[in-house]
Amino acid sequence: MSYNEFLPSYSIGHDCYKEIPYVTRRYGKTAVVIGGKTAMEKAKPELLAALKGSDLEITDFIWYGGDSNYENIEMLKAMPEVQNADMVFGVGGGRAVDTVKTLCDRIDKPFFTFPTLASNCASCTAISVIYNADGTFKEYAYLKAPALHTFINTKIIAESPEKLFWAGIGDALSKEYEVVFACRDKDMTHTPLLGRVLAEACTEPLVSYGKKALEDCRNNVSSKNIEQIALDIIITTGLVSNFTVHQNNPDPKDDYYYNSSLAHCVYYGASLFPKCEHDHLHGEIVSFGVLCLLTYDEQFEERQRIFEFNRSIGLPCTLGEIALTEEDVPAIAHKAASVVEWTYVPGEPTEEKFIKAILDTDKAGKEFLAKA
């Protein structure tokens, strides 16, 4: 059966918006910007300056509605400003960008993404996270293609909240371990094999540049460190996501989902507990999940390296650091066993084995911190 694989392209740098007229030249003369309020406030002066004197006109700046849900997508779809624009610029974080991606997939309109945070890879993936109107998770939307191009302004990234940048590092830390683990006992065809190989480039930049990049973000300095981490979080992990997920095929036997695994299973389970979900960020929780995956897979030497990395930048090494207790672990494992990632865990996963891995990780983390 035939299939398409559309690859993202990108521009990066403190002045990368100057490339917009050239990159978008084949798609029309008008663009509508849709994004978060703060994100558009940050990006608007840079966008207008970059387009001054060009043939491209921004016709409006529109708030995306506050969440990535079908209600907001339909609201935007009905707007004449959106209908009449030649292209759409999606500006902001993951939820704003996912809204624009899904909207443009439905109305078949060219779109470009402008991340203002380096906290996730939404800007260059063909997957959107969709929520219910009450804010709870609804489903993944599998799209036909990612953005035509992503513009990563490192000046804006450097001025973003340090805590979100920090959590982005924690989330990206999972990519290599989860993908390589999930692919282990599978018949790897061309596209997911590319994803697995590329995933192996995700961890080292985080370890090498992460701590210095956080310092630069704290000081609002656009630097090589910021650039390397932004590329890892947004581009490398995004490419891996596009290569390692195929859930939009009419024949289920051709589907696969190797994009995440047990580290995110910890997050899904932890999200059941408001004390964790409300006070701790997605990537923060996932970074503890990485340690649990390494324990489950008996990669103890690598786990020690990640204990040391997590401690060096303040990511968690124990349950207590994310407001969880040993008593919460069975519920975490039970939730984990219900998600798509569990289906692709190598071998024959059991809740009991996962419970033990989480508890053993917590114990090892306490011992590590006591000696540190």
Q: What feature does the model see in each segment?
A:
Residues 8, 105-202:
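A glycine/threonine-rich phosphate-anchoring loop and its flanking beta-alpha core
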Residues 1-86, 319:
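ATP/NTP phosphate-donor binding region
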Residues 3, 16-19, 299-372:
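C-terminal charged capping/lid subdomain of soluble metabolic enzymes
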Residues 17, 40-44, 70, 95-102, ...:
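Short glycine/serine/threonine-rich phosphate/pyrophosphate-binding segments
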